[in-house]
Regions:
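Low-complexity intrinsically disordered segments
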Residues: 1-5, 11, 71, 96
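C-terminal motif of bacterial Sec signal peptides marking the signal peptidase cleavage site
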Residues: 80-82
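Hydrophobic helical h-region of N-terminal Sec-dependent signal peptides
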Residues: 72-76
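Structured soluble/peripheral alpha/beta segments that form catalytic or ligand/cofactor-binding pockets
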Residues: 4, 84-415
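Short, low-complexity, intrinsically disordered N-terminal modules
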Residues: 4-8, 26-27, 49
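Short, low-complexity intrinsically disordered segments enriched in A/P/G/S/L with frequent Arg
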Residues: 11, 17-23, 35-41, 46, ...
Length: 415
C-alpha cells in the first residue's frame, strides 16, 4: 500500500562518512543487478532541492533545501581540507517562521548565469535517457560540484553513472580536482579531470568516460528554463540563500560507448543549476523526483525531511507542453513508496517504487526503478552514499494512458 506524504515519519540509518581526502583522480564501482523483492516496509520521506510552496517566497529556516543541506555541505568541507561533518545530535538555531523572501539581490540572467559564480556552493546536474540506433537503452547521470572558500583554491568534485538496461548493471565513477574553471562571455565550460561540460543558452554538451562506458553528448533545451520559486531565488534562513533553475526537457544526440562499442544515441535529458552562499545545516535528507512524460509535460517533486524524520517542506512544479509552470504545494500532490530495497553495499534501506498523484492535473503515476541497485557510494568525493536511479513511468491523465521516464534521488538513508 502506498503511503502519502501526510506527516509520515520514516527511518534513516547513519553511517560513517568514509575517508576525508582524495588526491585528484577517479574511483568507481560497477555492479550487476541484484535487486531484492519490493516490500511494504516503512518509508521515510526526504527532500532534495526544496523551493517554496508559497508563490511570494519563503524561508526554510534551519532546513536548507536539498543538496545544500547535506551533500554539498560535506563535499565542500572535504574540498577545503576538512571533514566538516557535524557531530551527532548537533543543532542549529531555529529560524523564524516562514515569511515572504526579500527581493532577490539581482534577477537570474540567462545565458550569463549558466557560467560559474564566486559563491560558496554551486553545482550543474544532468540526468537523461538514451536509446541507440539498435534500440538499446541507457540512463546517465553527470554532475559537477564547485566549492569556493576565500583564498583557498576552487574545489571540484564530479559523479558519472550509467544504467545499462541490457546488462542489468549500474556503473559509476567519482572524481575530485582543483582544475581552474574555464568560461567565456555568456557561457560555461568546466572540467573535472578529463570530464567536461559546458553550454551557451539552450545548447549544452557533456563528455565523460569511466570503466566500460563513455558519453559524448550534445543537448538542446526545447522549453524555457524553470525559475524555481518564481524568481529562481530561495532563502534558507540562517543557512544562506540560493539561486536555482532547471531545464526540464533537453533533446540529446551524440555517441555512447559501452564495453568498447560506440553507437549513436538520441534521447531526453534534465538539467539543474544551483548556486549561492549556503552552507551546512545538520541532519535530514531529501527525495527528489523528475518525470518527463510522453505527452510533452514534466513533473518535479521535492520532499525535505528534518533530522528526526519529519517532513519539513514540500515543493513541486508541473510544466505543460508550452513550458508554462504551475507551482505545486503540499496539498496539490500525493507521493508514497510501494516497496523498499536494502543495499548490500551501505546497509541502508531505501524506498523502491512510488505512486505519484497530482489531483489538479488529473495525473496518477507509478514509478518503478529500472534497477533496484542504483546506489552511489561516493564517500571518497562527497562524503555520502545516495541512491540516484532511472525509473520507468506509467499512469493516466483523466483516465487516458500515460507513459514516460524519470530519475529519483534519495539521500539521508545512508551516510
Amino acid at each position: 500500500m502506498s503511503k502519502t506524504i501526510t506527516l509520515t515519519q520514516g527511518k534513516r540509518e547513519n553511517r560513517g562518512a568514509g575517508p576525508c581526502a582524495l588526491p585528484p583522480g577517479r574511483v568507481g564501482g560497477s555492479r550487476e543487478a541484484a535487486g531484492s523483492p519490493a516490500g511494504a516496509g516503512s518509508y521515510g520521506f526526504l527532500a532534495r532541492r526544496a523551493s517554496s510552496s508559497q508563490p511570494d517566497g519563503f524561508s526554510l529556516g534551519r532546513f536548507a533545501g536539498g543538496r545544500p543541506a547535506l551533500l554539498l555541505a560535506i563535499l565542500l568541507a572535504l574540498l577545503v581540507g576538512g571533514c566538516g561533518a557535524p557531530a551527532a545530535g548537533s543543532k542549529l538555531e531555529m529560524a523564524p517562521a516562514p515569511t515572504p523572501a526579500p527581493v532577490p539581490p539581482r534577477p537570474v540572467v540567462l545565458p550569463a548565469d549558466e557560467a560559474a559564480h564566486d559563491n560558496l556552493s554551486e553545482w550543474w546536474y544532468y540526468t537523461g535517457h538514451l536509446r541507440t540506433e539498435s534500440g538499446e537503452k541507457y540512463g546517465f547521470e553527470l554532475v559537477f560540484f564547485q566549492g569556493v572558500r576565500g583564498q583557498n583554491p576552487v574545489g571540484y568534485a564530479a559523479h558519472f553513472a550509467i544504467t545499462d538496461h541490457q546488462q542489468g548493471s549500474f556503473s559509476y565513477e567519482e572524481k575530485v580536482d582543483r582544475t581552474l574553471r574555464v568560461q567565456g562571455e555568456g557561457q560555461y565550460r568546466l572540467a573535472v579531470g578529463d570530464w567536461t561540460m559546458g553550454g551557451q543558452g539552450d545548447d549544452h554538451y557533456l563528455r565523460a568516460q569511466g570503466k566500460g562506458y563513455a558519453v559524448d553528448l550534445k543537448l538542446h533545451a526545447t522549453k524555457p528554463p524553470v525559475l524555481h520559486n518564481g524568481a529562481g531565488w530561495l532563502s534558507f534562513g540562517p543557512a544562506g540563500d540560493s539561486y536555482y533553475y532547471s531545464r526540464t526537457r533537453m533533446e540529446v544526440g551524440g555517441v555512447l560507448q559501452a564495453n568498447g562499442v560506440s553507437e549513436r544515441v538520441t534521447g531526453l535529458a534534465w538539467m539543474d543549476h544551483q548556486w549561492g552562499d549556503f552552507i551546512l545545516v545538520n541532519g535530514g535528507g531529501w527525495d527528489w523526483y523528475s518525470v518527463q512524460l510522453g505527452d510533452g509535460t514534466e513533473v518535479m517533486v521535492t520532499l525535505l525531511r528534518d533530522q528526526p524524520g519529519n517532513v519539513a517542506a514540500v515543493y513541486g512544479s508541473y510544466v505543460d507542453r508550452q513550458g508554462r509552470v504551475t507551482e505545486l504545494k503540499a496539498g496539490d500532490l500525493e507521493v508514497g513508496a510501494t516497496g523498499s530495497w536494502r543495499s548490500p553495499h551501505s546497509g541502508a534501506t531505501y524506498p523502491s517504487g512510488w505512486k505519484l498523484r497530482l489531483p489538479g492535473q488529473g495525473i496518477e503515476l507509478t514509478l518503478e526503478p529500472v534497477l533496484r541497485d542504483q546506489e552511489l557510494n561516493t564517500t571518497r568525493s562527497t562524503g555520502v552514499s545516495y541512491w540516484e536511479g532511472e525509473v520507468q513511468v506509467s499512469g493516466t491523465r483523466g483516465g487516458a494512458s500515460l507513459s514516460g521516464e524519470g530519475y529519483v534521488e534519495l539521500t539521508g538513508y545512508a551516510r
